[in-house]
């Protein structure tokens, strides 16, 4: 069983997406004309700015710009024996005394969607840049392609780098440690989060 870990409610601090440490190089595919956006560093040291509520979560999410967790969360996963974890420390520019340390998580695990079992079809595929469109915007339930899984516990989901997919071992560790600002969805609701559950 796989799970998607997501952020929690708005009472927590959140990542200011306007002041991100990642930028993009953009170009157009000469075959189909679609925009190709390649992430790049915009600063030597990854920096973030926090806004919002008074509480600091263990999960910060910046959409396609990356997944940011507290260092404590990563340590909890590692102590549980989780595999597939790589990360870079992040500097909080408006750091306060109680601000925890944060890291930019780079999942080394991989698993993809079973498009056929999820009744999703790719259309208008471009052989040059690899981009395509889906025939369904909200497929449900989503099925995982188990043959695509590389066996690691902390994964990215196919073409969706903002989706943090984990095994039961990681979810159990998060629950035991009572990590803050985290919710999760079970396998069938991965990607579309129709039924978020609090950790």
Predicted regions and their residues:
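Phosphate/anion-contacting hairpin/loop surfaces
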Residues: 1-199
